[in-house]
Amino acid sequence: MQRPDMSVAVAGIKMRNPVMTASGTFGYGAEFADYLDLECIGAMISKGLSLKPKAGNPTPRIVETPGGMLNAIGLQNVGIDAFIEQKLPYLKNVNTPVIVNLYGNTLEEYGEVAARLDGLSGVAGIEVNISCPNVKQGGIVFGTDPGAAQEVVRLVKKNTTKPMIVKLSPNVTDVVLMAKACADAGADALSLINTLTGMAIDLERRRPVLANVTGGLSGPAIKPVALRMVWQVAKAVKLPLIGIGGIMNGRDALEFMLAGATAVQVGTASFLDPSAAQRIAREMEQYLVDHKIESVSSLIGALEL
């Protein structure tokens, strides 16, 4: 058979294959150019960008755990203006869609960052991180309150013409409720899941390992949770989904597609193997060849119950 068709599209963003890089694990893209061919992956997602530069949390802020890692980086980034001036020019010369992940500490910040990206060439879409505390509302996380999440999504939608992916938090009682709220507010696609909140303790020192005390758990340990949430949301919402959580190889990625994801994001795997995203895309294609499957899109939601 001829080579299988690996192309997919998420909210109008056409990709050569379903493998995207997860925000916060791939720098701004250029940092990984020596380790893999940036034009062999589906899309690149930037570090989370805020209105102003952010220094992040004190160290230590990363710790390995059984089956994964905890991070409390604190959304360190150069700020939206520096990204546009210093990082985006390089990315414009790469023939791979660039999606900008953005966040805010207030509703207004989300809207302002989205507005600054609107109309820019070289940005195929935006991913909205709603797992941030609303400093004007006592620190409640936008992504754990359906009403607050809808406010963010509506404002970003108002301020941009670019496709909008909303990244869902798993730290909720009902992820389907959050997914429906974001869909109703105008999300064009959903990515899930973000990290699970966890902590690590140093027994000898009787202190938390992370300076921030808690952090976000990622890696293979969260994959079963992520698969379950993707499957649940796929049954409830008619939007393209991007699966995230513990994807280390091509088989992992294809499992997410069976559960209902159109594409996947590779995150923690890139810390262990900087070329992971390209390798996973290659492994997915080889699986299709071995099983005589003509198109990867035929696997989306093809789970048999």
Swiss-Prot record:
Gene Ontology terms for molecular function: dihydroorotate dehydrogenase (NAD+) activity
Cellular component terms per the entry's GO annotation: cytoplasm
Enzyme Commission code(s) on record: 1.3.1.14
Cofactor details (free text): Binds 1 FMN per subunit.
Binding site for FMN: 23, 47-48, 101, 129, 167, 193, 219, 245-246, 267-268
Required cofactor names: FMN
GO biological process: 'de novo' pyrimidine nucleobase biosynthetic process; 'de novo' UMP biosynthetic process
HAMAP family linked: DHO_dh_type1
Family: Belongs to the dihydroorotate dehydrogenase family. Type 1 subfamily.
Record protein name field: Dihydroorotate dehydrogenase B (NAD(+)), catalytic subunit
